[in-house]
Each structure stands twice: as structure tokens, then as C-alpha cells.
Amino acid sequence: MQMIKKMALSETFPGILLIFFTFLALLCKNSSLSVIYTDFFHANFTVGFVHFQISKSLDLWINDGLIAIFFLCIGLELKYEILRGQLKNIRAVSLPIFGALGGMITPALIFAAINYSYDFAMKGWAIPTATDIAFAVGILMLLGNKIPTSLKLFLLSLAIFDDLGAIVIIALFYTDQLSALAIIICLFCIFALLLLNYYHITHLSLYVLVGVVLWIAMLKSGVHATLAGVIISLFIPLDTKNKKPYLHEVLKDLNPWVVYFILPLFAFANAGIDIRDMHLGSVFSPVSLGIILGLFLGKQLGVFIFCFIAIKLKLAKLPENIKYGKFYGICILTGIGFTMSLFIDGLAYKNSDIFEHADKLAILIASFLSAIVGFIYLKIVK
């Protein structure tokens, strides 16, 4: 029992859990359990009362609802690190920012270069721009003491800025037709959150209440509802009136739910791809190649080149006692897009099967390639 508890508390466990539920989803979708698996996640669930109801399939409740809590955690983490943590120093924060920029621009350009003549495929240009924090850090932790703390912090910081970039991309490019009334309600909710923050209110139930209303309003507005999580994170106070840490405590309470429940459930709901009738040629289709080359090559090259240029221009500094060889290994791991890439894929193609799920398979291939190559590279290079 003690051994199970120790394993569950280790930093590698979230990554292992994601891998397990990914393979479980693939097993379910490609076996006699396929119909049960599909029907379960497509089953409609209605929440509300007589005159106000929200009805969605289970997979959409996960993708639109639970993932908002994940984005809330990302927002809280970033806010804490910038105001109190490792990113307080501008020199420390500049390297992961440049890396995140390179890791978004380069994969997007590679995807666009391959798919520019296919209008529908081009909707997925942002798919290879994401990094999965839990998976990437989980792989890194498997290497133990071989990786210096400064490099672990760089990867975590870069992944946070990467996810922030993904949030901006979702807001700007994957927003449906807007509803003026719903947006007005969103603004009222934001004003309410501002008041709660201004008066240093630390009753979490009030933030939850306003947050739920904000999430519903955003759902109806046309702006993706998961952004509600980011907005809420901006207004949660750092400390209580007595100067006791508050934001960090909220993050500590939420984090286990995200890494042990929400992300594994998201992986299980979205990684189920039927590959039984898939032709090998579909993996070499333009959309698949764009995703694989963008994630596996574009991410590592983009992150490294942008960081290298920033260092040479003295805009950023390589962590102390770190050589470029080891640093490049971290850049390879940024190609693990997995859950974030699957999420953007769902927004871009609305879960269409026009590509026969070759797009999702490409995400898995690129993510596992980045994980395996990055792990072996970091194991070998000193």
C-alpha cells in the first residue's frame, strides 16, 4: 500500500497515467468494446431545470467543461510564477518566452507550407503549436537526477507560456459567431470577479458561483467556454487579508484533480481512434505530415533556434552550467503535443472524420516520437 501511495505521489505518475489511458482508449476503440466506448462518450447529459437546460454529449462536457478547470490551473500557475516564483526576473522569463514563440511559429509555418492549398485542412494550422505539460514533465522526471533543476524549470515555464499562446489562439481563431447578450453577461461576471479581488474576498464558493455563470455565458456567447478558467484565474487573490498564501493553496487543491482525473479522462475520451481500416497512406496525407513534421521537427527546431538567437543577441541567458547539447534534448520534448493538440484538433475540425482520424493518429505518432527520441537523447548526451 505504501508503495502504491509513493508511486501516486511521484512526479512521473501523471505522465504514466496519460500513457495508460491513451492506450486504453485505443484498445477500447479497436476491439469488441468499440460500440460501448463510442456510445458512452456520445451519450447526452442534460443539466439544469425546466426553462434553462444545457444538453451536451459526455465528450463535450469533458472538452468544454472539465478542461476549463485545467486552464484555470494554467492561469493560476502562470500568475503565481510571474508575481512570486521563478519568472519574477525578466532575464529568467525571457528565454522560455522566446522558446514558446519559436515553438508556435515554426510548426505553424511547416503545417501551412504542406497544407496551404487545402482550405479545410488549413483550419488545423495551430494543432502542432501546443505542448502537453503533464506528459512532457512526466517524461523528464523519468530521467531523475540526470536533468538539472534549471532545465526542468525551463521546460515547465516554456510549456506554461506555450499553453498561454494556445489560449490566445483559441480566443482569436476558434471562436464561433458571437452573441451580444451573452458577452454582456460575461462582462458583468468579470466585473463581479474584479470586485471580489478588489475587496480581497477569499471565499472560494463565491468565485465558483460567478465562475459557473461566466462559463455558461461564454458557452452561449460563441467564445470557447474553456477561456472562463483563464479569466477566473486572473482575479483570484495571491494572499488573504492576513497575508496568508491563498492562490497557491487553491492551486494545490485543484492540481491533483487535474493531473489524476481531468487530463486522464480527457485522454481517454479523445485518444480513441479506430485504426483497423486505416490505410498506411493516410499517415502520409498532407494534414498528417503537417502535424507530424510540425510537432516533431518544427517544435524542437523552433524552440532551439529562437532561444539560440535570443542568447546571441543577449536578450536571454542560457541556464548556468548548461551546455547546448543537453538544452536541445529539452527542446525535443516540447514536441509532445498530445492532449493540447487533440483539444485544438477538436476545435479546428469539429471532430469531423473527413481525414478518417489520420489527424489524431498523427498527433499520437508525433507526441510519442518526441517523447521516445527526447528520452533516449537526454539519457545519452551529457
Swiss-Prot record:
HAMAP family referenced in this protein's UniProt entry, alphabetically: NhaA
Reaction(s) catalysed by this chain's protein: Na(+)(in) + 2 H(+)(out) = Na(+)(out) + 2 H(+)(in)
One Pfam short name: Na_H_antiport_1
GO molecular function per UniProt: sodium:proton antiporter activity
Family: Belongs to the NhaA Na(+)/H(+) (TC 2.A.33) antiporter family.
Subcellular location: Cell inner membrane
Transmembrane segments: 7-27, 58-78, 94-114, 124-144, 153-173, 178-198, 199-219, 255-275, 291-311, 327-347, 361-381
Membrane topology: Multi-pass membrane protein
One Gene Ontology cellular component: plasma membrane
Role summary: Na(+)/H(+) antiporter that extrudes sodium in exchange for external protons.
Protein name: Na(+)/H(+) antiporter NhaA 2
Gene Ontology BP, a term: regulation of pH
Alphabetical keyword list: Antiport, Cell inner membrane, Cell membrane, Ion transport, Membrane, Sodium, Sodium transport, Transmembrane, Transmembrane helix, Transport
Tree of life domain: Bacteria
Main location: membrane
